[in-house]
Amino acid sequence: MPSPDTPVPSPSAPASGPASASRRYIAETRAFFASRAATWDTRFGDDMPAYAAAVARAGIRRGGVAIDVGCGTGRALPALRSAVGRDGAVIAADLTPEMLAQARPQAAAARAALVLADARRLPFADGSADAFFAAGLVNHLPDPQAGLAELARVTRPDGLLILFHPSGRAALAARHGRTLTQDEPLSAGPLRRSTAATGWRLAAYDDAVDHFFALAVRC
C-alpha cells in the first residue's frame, strides 16, 4: 500500500523467462517494503480518514466478504469492518511478511484475517469475495491487466473493486519527478479498457488533487 511520497520499485526485466521474472518481482517487492514496514505508519499514518472515506464512498454491502489486497499496515481495515458489519468478513492480504506484522493491531481491532499472498495468484476460491480494496497496487504489478483478471476471478457478480490512492495521479507523479502520461494503467482510457477486458464495468473515476478513486463492478 504505497504512500503518496514513496516510489515503489518498477518490475524488472526477466532474467530468463516468466518464472525468473516472477521470483525477482517478489524478492524486490518484499525487500522494498520489509525495510520500511516498521516506520511506515510513523511516516504516513495520517491518511486513515482518506481510506475510510474511500471505503464509505464505495457502498460495500453489509454482511459481505471484503478483502484488502496489498493491505500494508492495515489502514483500510477499520473502515472495511464498519462497512461489512459484525456479520461480514474482512481479510487483509499482503506479499510482505513484515507489513502483515505491522498490520496486526489494526487486524485485531477489525477482526480481520491476515493472509500472506501474492495478488497475482490469490489463495481464494472463485466468486468468494464481495469487494476488493486495492490501494496503490494494480499499477505496480508487472501485468496490471492480469492482476485485474485475478481480482475478477475471486469476485462474485456485482461485487466491487475499489482502486485508491491518498494522492491524485498528477500530484504523485510530480513528487516523483516524472511526467504523467495518458497511457498509464490508471489513466481513464486504459483503465476503462482493461477493466472491460477482465470482467469489470468501470462505474466511477475520480482523479483529484488529493486522492485517486476508481470503482469497478464485476460483470
Please provide the spans of the model-predicted regions.
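Conserved class I S-adenosyl-L-methionine
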Residues: 2-62, 75-79, 102, 162-185, ...
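A short SAM/SAH-binding and catalytic strip from SAM-dependent methyltransferases
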Residues: 131-143
